């Protein structure tokens, strides 16, 4: 008989899970934080995030940086990857994509703090950067700068 662990209820990790057709169908999974009560920051970086323009259907590209200070829960990284991939065929503006990702994670994890930076590549000659966070960053945790430089063309 196998012993139940914090990973026992995960459905996607270790299985052949397909990319959901859209973000609404994506299942984000969480695991109990074995270091709950210890203040620390978790960072996920998605340098090749893609979605579709809802008007033209053309692809949009972004560099996403997600930082959070966990409470009782951690996001399972394969489920996060599949959730982010589900935006590939989803039409929404940059602001909607970025804030939706942040809100879904907050709803799932109930973190002490979370922020997401969406650094979108230019469309129509204008880069769009979108930032969402749940409040002031905790003072007792090292939270590095996101480190994504401002977009700069020639010059």
Curated annotation (Swiss-Prot):
GO terms for molecular function: preQ1 synthase activity. GO terms for cellular component: cytoplasm. Transmembrane segments: none annotated. The active site is at residues 53, 60. Disulfide bonds: none annotated. SUPFAM superfamilies: Tetrahydrobiopterin biosynthesis enzymes-like. Substrate binds at residues 75-77, 94-95. Its EC number is 1.7.1.13. Belongs to the GTP cyclohydrolase I family. QueF type 1 subfamily. Catalyzes the NADPH-dependent reduction of 7-cyano-7-deazaguanine (preQ0) to 7-aminomethyl-7-deazaguanine (preQ1). This is NADPH-dependent 7-cyano-7-deazaguanine reductase. It comes from Brucella anthropi (strain ATCC 49188 / DSM 6882 / CCUG 24695 / JCM 21032 / LMG 3331 / NBRC 15819 / NCTC 12168 / Alc 37) (Ochrobactrum anthropi). The lineage of its organism: Bacteria, Pseudomonadati, Pseudomonadota, Alphaproteobacteria, Hyphomicrobiales.
